Amino acid sequence: MLIGIDVGGTTTDAVLVDGSRVEKTAYVPTDHNDLLGCLLGALDELVRGVDVSKIERVVLSTTLITNMIAEKKTDPVALVLIPGPGTNPQDYNLGPSIILDGAIDFRGKEIDRLNESQIKDAAARIKESGVSRVAVVGKFSQRNPAHEEKVSQIMSQILPGSKIELGHRVSGHLNFPRRAATTKLTLATKESYARFALAISRALEERRITAPVYILKADGGTLPLEGSLQMPVETIFSGPAASIM
C-alpha cells in the first residue's frame, strides 16, 4: 500500500492506495502555522484501522520552504560573491552581498587572484554583524572550485562555528545568478527543514510506519526524505506540484 499526503492551501489531503484501488481518503484543515501537525493529523485519520506493516511507501508534499521564503522567515545568510569581470551582481536581485576580487574563467583557469586581506576583512564584517551562515559563490566555481574553497578556508578560521556553504557543492549548473540564489536559500532554510524532517521521521517511527518516505519536488519527481536534507530548496513548489498532479 502507498500513502500520499498533500498540504494544500485550505485542506491537507491524504490518500491510501492499494495497487490501482483507492482504499481510503482523509483530510484536515490546513494550519499554515503548524504544517507538521496537519500532515500527522491527516496521516492518523488515514491509517486508523489499517495494518501499517503493509505500507510500502509514503510520499509527502509540503509548502514549508515556500512559506518560509514568501513570508521572509528564513535564517539570515551572508552572501559572498566572486563574480569576476563582465557581471554586475546588483542586477541579480539577491539582496545585500559582499563582492570579492578574483576570477576563474569558463575553462576553469584562474585569471585574477584572490585578495586574502580582502577576504579577512569581509569575514571580520560578517563576524561583527552576528550572522553565522555564509554562502560563498564564484562565477565558474563548478569548473574550478579553488577560489570558493580558499575563501571558505580563510573565513572558517575567523568565523569558527559558522556554517559555510559553497556554490559548487549545491549546483553544477552554469547559471551564476541562479546558483547564488540556490546556495543562499539552501543555507537559509536547511536548519528549519532538518527539524521538520526529523519530526516526521520520529512521528512515523512512533506510529510503527517503517516504509521509506519521499518528498515531492516541483518537477513532479520525488526525493528521499533523508536526501532532501542537503537540498531543501528542491521542495519549493512541492505543494503546487501535488495540486497539478
What would you call each of these model-derived segments?
Residues M1-M245:
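N-terminally biased helix-coil "hinge/interface" segments that flank
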